[in-house]
Each structure stands twice: as C-alpha cells, then as structure tokens.
Amino acid sequence: ASSAASDVYKRQVILSAGAINSPQILQISGIGPADILKKNGIKIMHDLYGVGKNLKDHYNVRLTGRVKNISTINEQPRGMPLIKEIIKYFWNGNSILSLGPTLVYCFWHSDETIKNHDLQMTFTPASYPEGNQAGLDTEPGFSIAAWQQRPESLGWVTIKSSDPFEKPIIQPNYLSAPEDQRVAVEGIR
C-alpha cells in the first residue's frame, strides 16, 4: 500500500524556495540534521547534515551623509512634491516613482592583485534611517554602499519548531572570515 506522501517522496522534486525557505521546508519535512529534527519533534525522513549549513550572503556597509543647499529624493515623496511626482509619472513616466532604488553602480577591486572585481559600490541621492530602508530620512541626504561579491563567511538556517509559519533562526555570521573583514574595510575606504 502506498500513501500520497510516499508517492511524492518517490518522485524527483526540485525545491526552489530560496536560501532561507528551502532549508526550512526541508527541515520541517523531515530532511536535515537529525539533532535539529529530533529537537523539534519531527520524524526523520533523511538525516542530511548539510541542510541549512553554508549560508552565504552579501554583507553591505552603507554610509550616509547630509547635504545643504541641494534637493535629494528624500524631500520628494511628501506632501505637494509627492503629488507633483505622481502627476509627472502618469503624464510621461518620468518621475522619482520610475527610478530604481540605486542610481549608480560600479564594480571595484579591493586589492589591485585580484583579477576579478570583489566589490560592488552603489550611490543613491537619498538616505534611510539607520536599520530601515522602508522609509526615507526627512533631511536631504545621500547613501553610498559597498557589497562584497564573493563572501567567505559561512552562516546557517535552522527551524525553531515544526510550525511552517514560524520564521526560522538565521545566523549569517557576517564578517566572520578575515578576508570578508578586509574587503569591507577596503570598500569603506
């Protein structure tokens, strides 16, 4: 006798839910490190140590500054300037509403001896409150950011419970590798 679960299990399945959700789905489905599955009361379908391991993410260092006597995007999405931008957008499509989040990109070497670029730099004529990129600062400002393109630091993702709606624990271990620290400092310079 076969069940729907075993029929699905026998087929090849491609799971593509991203670096965070893929290990979470696998772990709550019983595929992952046995100790994590047992701790969360999940039946072990396949003890696979690497599920949730080796998380790599592009850490960025963002620098912001204030400007005087010049307008930036910060002032545009409020009050009458916002209404003007909405009208411009619907009139001809040219407005701050048609801009991407970053206006200038460049790729850079943190060290002249490196063959491939290992830094991405960005510039935006806007600034955001610390720890938040959902809203703009109220004063005129700009942002410059540097991202390491090939991080070496390894993190992990693990479930907190068997509840698929509970967010997993994410430990990116940013800057834990000395090379990542060096590249971040060079990006700031």
PLM features per residue range, with description:
Residues Q12, P23, P33-D137:
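Mid-to-C-terminal "cap/lid" subdomains and adjacent gly/pro-rich loops that border
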Residues V104-R189:
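C-terminal catalytic lobe of FAD-dependent flavoproteins
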Residues A1-A5, Y9:
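Single conserved hydrophobic/aromatic residue that forms the stacking wall/gate
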Residues K10-I28:
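Short hydrophobic core segments
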Residues I31, K56, N60, K68, ...:
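Short capping/connector residues at structural and topological boundaries
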Residues S2, A19, G30, N60:
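ATP/adenylate-binding site constellation spanning eukaryotic-like Ser/Thr protein kinases
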